[in-house]
């Protein structure tokens, strides 16, 4: 094999390792959604209270993403990733042996702390380690890894939880993370911090109206999604009256739609980023609005879940690339803010869904989410109408160099 070919294969192996890490981080972030009823039962708590682990996780990430990013802005990235994975593994082992609910909450806080840095630095790192002519495909592979978390991670985690208990699911996640740690140790080169930004970057970033609008949109639209999605498992069991196995299959379909969204993203995003994001938001709004109606029949629930997944995955892909586009000079700081705001949305959505359940009933979580989504859709249109001329639709060559 020629040295060039060997180097290229090693670069692809690094990208795939990041995609695998994305799979594990996304799986563990959302696995409580699939195990919520089992966790509640094991601690003799109502589901609405157990949902606190989703809210706490999200808010820890939202509060710590930017401070931790700034504290580690100059840290060498390979060593930082290895240290993060050590804490990630130890936190999952604590989840396995958690003797009461609050110990589990503490363990999830540990995982959330690793999350707060991992997603702040990963998008720019995967571009750096990829072959020079395959940087956009590298982001696509990372997105596929995240989508596979929904396709395989959540359904398999749920199945493992059903047969062996929810603790076994966390134990297996820890084992996979050990494998990823070894791969990072073997494959990654020395990675000095690059274009991370600093505290001085904040005033500059906050003078960019398109970026600020994107952050506001992120909080609103993610809140809309998680108002319903945080409680989709009890919704399917109690409102759709599905069996446990059928509910697991619906989660599989939801995840499968993420692959479809990734393919659509690669095909259409560059031709019209704003149109792509608008389409995805419209799809999310429609599916949330129709959630209760679709729940009356199993086949309509499957169909709606598939389109719902395309909508939210398309939004996530589009917004992440848009952040990199609008802040190529401070990618890690901009992504840390994005990750923090995204998780504010998750926590707010889970909390709002909890309140809707308690005051109006589980059946109305979709309608409540749709109202938020409409607000986000209107905000996005207004911001683009007023400030859209300030940014080109495609990354310039110079911006690509800065991102890479």
Curated annotation (Swiss-Prot):
Keywords: Cell inner membrane, Cell membrane, Membrane, Sugar transport, Transmembrane, Transmembrane helix, Transport. One of its GO terms (cellular component) is plasma membrane. Pfam families: MFS_1 (PF07690). CDD domains: MFS_NepI_like (cd17324). Gene3D superfamilies: MFS general substrate transporter like domains. The chain crosses the membrane at residues 15-35, 51-71, 85-105, 109-129, 137-157, 168-188, 209-229, 245-265, 276-296, 299-319, 333-353, 363-383. The keyword Membrane applies. Coiled coil: none annotated. The keyword Cell inner membrane applies. InterPro entries: MFS (IPR011701), MFS_dom (IPR020846), MFS_Efflux_Transporters (IPR050189), MFS_trans_sf (IPR036259), Sugar_effux_transptr_put (IPR023495). It is a multi-pass membrane protein. Its main location: membrane. It is found in: Cell inner membrane. Belongs to the major facilitator superfamily. SotB (TC 2.A.1.2) family. Involved in the efflux of sugars. The physiological role may be the reduction of the intracellular concentration of toxic sugars or sugar metabolites. This is Probable sugar efflux transporter. It comes from Pasteurella multocida (strain Pm70).
